[in-house]
């Protein structure tokens, strides 16, 4: 697939928000939008609200190597550390919304009685989880916001390095291809699962996975803006595996997507 970003012939986007304003927003996010996860070592996660029926479902997004299907099946208890407090949750099938080892991502529901913390969630227009492999003809209009992401765009990561306080790392987008992001932000152990955001408009565009073997760049996954609305007819949006291809469910675009997202009915 041709790299869509290269086709635009745009090197750097204008930064409409001053660094001072950006740092103020980052300070707010540092306190209650991300957490350190103590499980299989230490990693980072961030809080998002995803659309479900007529409401937004609060979840934590992290990597599959931080929380995996074995943790769910074993009902493991894990601790999430925020700057303003700690949350302990027991993993089970009712919490699991999505996990995929190949894509290295996990989404876990956060319940109201899990905490009394003032969590600030990334919401719908901040970006949300999905992965696509579409040519331009197949692209639905809700992917148009991707046209506003440029190579060499200034970005930052919010993360909890291992045994350290929260850390902000700045860098540039080096490449976007299909669902993959390459960037050059400075990373440390424990950074996996960090949100990747644009400096110019604070949009959440990705999740950091790890560094390359040669350490020439760092790897992440793309989070798509304006996630597909759940169908009023089909109460669950089922995303299934079809021959390993990253394409969308037939009801939406005659195809389907890697992995399975099972949003269960409310009791």
Where are these regions (language model features)?
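Catalytic nucleophile loop of clan PA
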Residues: 46, 174, 186-209
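N-terminal activation segment of mature serine protease catalytic domains
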Residues: 3-50, 60, 105-106
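Generic short N-terminal amphipathic or hydrophobic helices
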Residues: 4, 9, 16, 24-25, ...
């Amino acid at each position: 697939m041709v790299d869509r970003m290269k086709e635009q012939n745009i090197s750097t986007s204008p930064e409409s928000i001053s660094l001072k304003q950006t740092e103020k927003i980052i300070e707010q996010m540092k306190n209650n939008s991300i957490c350190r996860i103590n499980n299989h070592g230490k990693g980072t996660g961030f809080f998002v609200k995803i659309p479900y029926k007529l409401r937004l479902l609060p979840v934590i997004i992290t990597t599959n190597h931080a929380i995996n299907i074995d943790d769910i099946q074993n009902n493991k208890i894990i601790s999430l550390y925020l700057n303003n407090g700690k949350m302990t949750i027991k993993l089970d099938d009712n919490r699991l919304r999505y996990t995929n080892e190949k894509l290295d991502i996990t989404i876990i529901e956060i319940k109201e009685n899990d905490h009394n913390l003032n969590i600030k969630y990334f919401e719908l227009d901040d970006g949300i989880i999905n992965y696509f492999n579409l040519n331009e003809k197949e692209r639905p209009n809700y992917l148009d916001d991707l046209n506003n992401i440029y190579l060499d765009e200034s970005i930052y990561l919010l993360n909890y390095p291992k045994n350290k306080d929260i850390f902000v790392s700045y860098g540039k987008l080096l490449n976007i291809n299909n669902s993959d992001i390459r960037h050059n932000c400075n990373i440390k152990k424990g950074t996996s699962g960090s949100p990747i955001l644009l400096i110019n408009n604070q949009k959440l565009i990705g999740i950091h996975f790890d560094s390359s073997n040669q350490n020439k760049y760092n790897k992440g996954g793309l989070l798509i803006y304006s996630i597909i609305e759940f169908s009023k007819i089909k109460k669950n949006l089922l995303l299934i595996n079809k021959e390993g291809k990253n394409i969308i469910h037939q009801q939406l675009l005659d195809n389907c997507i890697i992995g399975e997202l099972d949003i269960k009915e409310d009791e």
